[in-house]
Amino acid sequence: MSVLQTELPSLSGKTCLITGGAGGLGKAIAIAFLKAGSNVVICDINEERVKQTSAELEGMGSLLAKTVDITKLSEVQQLFDDISSKFVKLDILINNAAIMDRFEPVGDVDPELWDRVLAVNLTAPLLLSKLAVQGMLLQENTNGSIINIASGSAKAGWLAGKHPITMQTLKHGLIGLTKSTAAFYGTKGIRCNALMLGIIGGTNLNDAFQNGVHPEGRQKLGEILSGVRPLPCDVKDIAELCVSLATGPGWNVVNGAVIAVDRGWTSIVG
């Protein structure tokens, strides 16, 4: 009896851009796309991490690593110019980069932090998606895919112990961006979907807790997680899902979807 083995689809000739690609989930996604034969572009604001990841992934495939502040349109435009120069076209965009808030409720929210989180987590995906679709539409046979990385906080307030105002509001916005993009460009050969992640291991989120969080927000997080403890998802599994969703068999009919990636957790607490 033969054992059925699953393989990632071949992405030879495809080019994928991953924001926040120098660490955590972004790095895992980059590795998965390199293994699938794709040209991979990673960008990250952390220059040292970009250099380290670039050196680590050297030899795995065709890689372009850039230090970019994705909140600045001029730097994003330069990134797309660099992609065009090296790989000619972009086929897949994964909006993965994000920063944390401090679990502040609306009465205590810091307007400056709000603006910063908004810029990274929502405005930047808009800018990147804008330039991505403009380039994709110029291709002779447009077959583009945009994947937005969202979370359980996009579903309901405090779901998954997530953020009471800033991140929750912005993740809802990211879902709106996903559906709007999918609705307008689906008939033009560009799909846009979102992954609504639960708890994942192997990320940089623990760094955020070193900067201090709202004490009551931290308490709520503990209460929710102790009520129905989620099973964490491995970044490798999420990365391979991104590859399949981008170009895998059967996924070409999936557009505008918000896919829960949490081992069924939101089916219990959602």
UniProtKB/Swiss-Prot annotation:
Gene Ontology BP annotations: fatty acid biosynthetic process; terpenoid biosynthetic process
Enzyme class: oxidoreductase
Its EC number(s): 1.1.1.-
Top-rank lineage group of the source organism: Eukaryota
Example of a GO MF term: oxidoreductase activity, acting on the CH-OH group of donors, NAD or NADP as acceptor
Pathway noted in the entry: Secondary metabolite biosynthesis; terpenoid biosynthesis
Keyword Ligase listed: no
Applications: Diterpenoid pyrones display various biological activities and FDDP E shows anti-HIV activity. FDDP D and FDDP E show also inhibitory activity of 42-mer-amyloid beta aggregation that is involved in the pathogenesis of Alzheimer's disease.
Catalytic residues in the record: 171
Keyword vocabulary terms for this entry: NADP, Oxidoreductase
Entry-linked Pfam families: adh_short_C2 (PF13561)
Chain positions recorded as NADP(+) binding sites: 18, 69, 96, 130, 171, 200, 204
Family per record: Belongs to the short-chain dehydrogenases/reductases (SDR) family.
Function in brief: Short chain dehydrogenase/reductase; part of the gene cluster that mediates the biosynthesis of diterpenoid pyrones. The first step of the pathway is the synthesis of the alpha-pyrone moiety by the polyketide synthase dpfgA via condensation of one acetyl-CoA starter unit with 3 malonyl-CoA units and 2 methylations. The alpha-pyrone is then combined with geranylgeranyl pyrophosphate (GGPP) formed by the GGPP synthase dpfgD through the action of the prenyltransferase dpfgC to yield a linear alpha-pyrone diterpenoid.
Name under which the protein is recorded: Short chain dehydrogenase/reductase dpfgG
Organism name: Gibberella zeae (strain ATCC MYA-4620 / CBS 123657 / FGSC 9075 / NRRL 31084 / PH-1)
